[in-house]
Amino acid sequence: MESLSEVSVQFSQLSMFPFFDMAHYLASVMSAREQAGALDIASHSPMASWFSAMLHCFGGGILSSILLAEPPVGILANTTNIMLASAIWYMVYYFPYDLFYNCFFFLPIRLIAAGMKEVTRTWKILSGITHAHSHYKDAWLVMITIGWARGAGGGLISNFEQLVRGVWKPESNEFLKMSYPVKVTLIGAVLFTLQHGHYLPISRHNLMFIYTMFLVSIKVTMMLTHSAGSPFLPLETPLHRILFGLRQNQAEVRESPSSSGAKGKPSKKTLDKDSGEQSNKKDK
């Protein structure tokens, strides 16, 4: 048990720059390139393609800055990270013969990059919660919101990113149909906020280690099995019925008598047919 605690302490002291940040930028830009029409945008409007890729990479920082009334352009002050993400964007889109993209499209490399990106998600959630706490002391909702925005900002602002590429899909709003990364980030923001308020009997470094291992294992499993659904679905369905299905059940109960009554009544077509047969009998 002590060895596990030591491992979690050392894990919590990992530096995200440069390797984990590079993996995050690589996975984000690869995801941006695989969007419909992304290559056409890159060939006709490189500036729009670059801005779209930067939203994928730094969307969490931009969204959290907007929510805290801070200048969103402050992300540009980190010149080193911007240049690193821009270099990866250029090589993914414009490297001769797509050698860079095809090299990192190799599944084992993509698994490593995706796993490292999930590690950065934990650090982003924590940094968002800490940053929100410095502005609003022990404001739970603010801390959860900023941690959620910092960790899943790229998904939460996906509609704006689509507008940059000239696409408008309001039905793809994350608030209407949350994707797995957005859901699991919200859960992480709640857990780390509770831990920050000492309402969870677990140390921060242990929670970081357990949560990150969960993220990495689920992400790798989903990529290996080519699963696009949420692993939380078996829990979401019964919970939704229990918490939000009451009105739906009442509506079904109200509709059932009318439907059963309708079954007992003869249709208009049947009545017309019967009346026609009776008139024919009279003529005979």
UniProtKB/Swiss-Prot annotation:
Residues 33-44, 100-102, 158-178, 226-284 are cytoplasmic. Keywords: Endoplasmic reticulum, Ion channel, Ion transport, Membrane, Potassium, Potassium channel, Potassium transport, Transmembrane, Transmembrane helix, Transport. Residues 269-284 have a biased composition (Basic and acidic residues). GO terms for molecular function: identical protein binding; potassium channel activity. One of its GO terms (biological process) is regulation of release of sequestered calcium ion into cytosol. GO terms for cellular component: endoplasmic reticulum; endoplasmic reticulum membrane. Homotrimer; conformation seems to be controled by binding to diacylglycerol (DAG). It catalyses: K(+)(in) = K(+)(out). It is found in: Endoplasmic reticulum membrane. A 1,2-diacyl-sn-glycero-3-phospho-(1D-myo-inositol-4,5-bisphosphate) binds at residues 117, 121. Residues 1-15, 69-79, 122-139, 197-204 are lumenal. It is a multi-pass membrane protein. This is Trimeric intracellular cation channel type B-B. Belongs to the TMEM38 family. Residues 250-284 are annotated as: Disordered. Coiled coil: none annotated. Intracellular monovalent cation channel required for maintenance of rapid intracellular calcium release. Acts as a potassium counter-ion channel that functions in synchronization with calcium release from intracellular stores. Activated by increased cytosolic Ca(2+) levels. It comes from Xenopus laevis (African clawed frog). Channel activity is activated by increased cytosolic Ca(2+) levels and blocked by luminal high Ca(2+) levels. The lineage of its organism: Eukaryota, Metazoa, Chordata, Craniata, Vertebrata. The chain crosses the membrane at residues 16-32, 45-68, 80-99, 103-121, 140-157, 179-196, 205-225.
